Amino acid sequence: KMAMQYYVNKNQRREKVLSLKNSYHGDTFKTMEVGDSSEYHFAFKQKTNVDHINTNIEELEDAFKNHGEEYYCMIVEPLLQGAGGMKMYDISFLKRARELCDEYGVLLIFDEVATGFGRTGNRFVSDLVLPDIVCLGKALTGGYIGHAATVASDKVYEAFYSDESGKALMHGPTFMGNALAMTAGIKSLEIFKRENYMKKISHIEEFSKKLLSGYKNPKIKEIRIMGGCIAVEANN
């Protein structure tokens, strides 16, 4: 929503989104559209203004070469795709995506609802590659109460900063700024820092790799480890 209006406010017409295969971004209509999960959204016809690519730099470059000036955003789950099968990929893909988004004037969105707060072994993947918009949730409140945050760069903010009411981002959910959720969020952040969860996650990753490295079993196709995530893919 923010990315779409960003270009409207700048009097530019862009109508396409670049997303990833195996992606999942939620269950509202627009997030279902940019996701690649027919298993979840089989009852809803998929629109044709979204391109889905693999986490392959050659496919990424081809997509921008063919449609770069039509995209208003590229949205990804950075480094780790959760509901799409715990798929893990290299940060070089995100670095190239950042370069191409800058070259073609496309907003880069990181959906860190699942990957944020250390899940990948990084506090945020956004610390390594800076997006224009980042979405946060889940661990933000420690799982005790539903709450989320959307963080935007100065560039995005400035496109909405105007005396013209038509340029404002009209967004006001009933539970926005909920006091109980905000309190849980503040405490969750305090605990995350005080108990040094990044160090704990590092130990989990190190131990898991030591334990599972080289493990062979005819029933197991692959074992993937990243940060606090362990994916064991069975042979089907």
List where the protein language model places each region:
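Conserved N-terminal phosphate-binding loop of PLP-dependent enzymes in the Aspartate aminotransferase
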Residues: 1-236
